[in-house]
């Protein structure tokens, strides 16, 4: 699986429609301060499902819309933004039977609030479906696929136990353990329901006699 391109529409510093192609051998993005390099990382985190606006360097989701200013009476500015990520999925790393897969996530202003929408290949999707597909592929907004500023120093200051947890996260062990706990919890609930149903069945038989 390889990231082929990113498309922006009024996302943070990217006004209008902007496409960033990521061809074979593409290794870095350079530019002066304030040119939008970090906003590319923010866009990837946004698509991957970051629920923390702090991680996206914004106080509110609406601040991801280009030119948005809280309390501004200006009515001509953008009322929405979106980001699309296209992947080469010829190796079927993503659990979708397509060679090219595009994920789109957007925000729309609705009065003083915002609504968020999700699409896979222009078809309506959900946050849960995004999360499920990305987690199976080992991609997490809060994982270690993306190393942000300060992460290296933070890792060097971790205890042995904290480093082990980090390695388990990268290896997918934590996600597996969470699913295992959820499955066990569901099984216990089902077993409790079966016991209750058996008791009711016995009570019904006694009543019929």
Language model features: what each stretch is:
Residues 2-209:
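Gly/Lys-enriched N-terminal cap/neck module of very large, oligomeric protein machines
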């Amino acid at each position: 699986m390889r990231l082929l391109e990113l498309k922006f529409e009024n996302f943070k510093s990217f006004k209008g429609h902007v496409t960033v192609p990521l061809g074979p051998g593409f290794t870095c993005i350079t530019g002066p301060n304030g040119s939008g390099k970090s906003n590319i990382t923010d866009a990837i985190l946004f698509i991957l499902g970051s629920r923390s606006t702090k991680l996206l360097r914004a106080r509110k989701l609406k601040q991801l819309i280009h030119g948005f200013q809280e309390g501004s009476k200006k009515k001509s500015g953008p009322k929405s933004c979106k980001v699309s990520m296209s992947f080469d999925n010829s190796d079927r790393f993503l659990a979708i039977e397509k060679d090219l897969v595009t994920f789109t996530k957007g925000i729309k202003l609705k009065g003083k609030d915002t609504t968020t929408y999700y699409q896979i290949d222009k078809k309506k999707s959900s946050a849960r479906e995004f999360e499920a597909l990305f987690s199976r592929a080992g991609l997490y907004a809060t994982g270690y696929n993306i190393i942000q500023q300060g992460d290296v120093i933070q890792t060097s200051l971790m205890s042995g136990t904290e480093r082990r947890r980090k390695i388990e996260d990268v290896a997918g062990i934590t996600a597996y353990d969470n699913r295992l706990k959820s499955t066990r919890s569901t099984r216990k609930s089902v077993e409790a329901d079966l016991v209750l149903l058996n008791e009711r069945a016995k009570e019904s038989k006694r009543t019929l006699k």
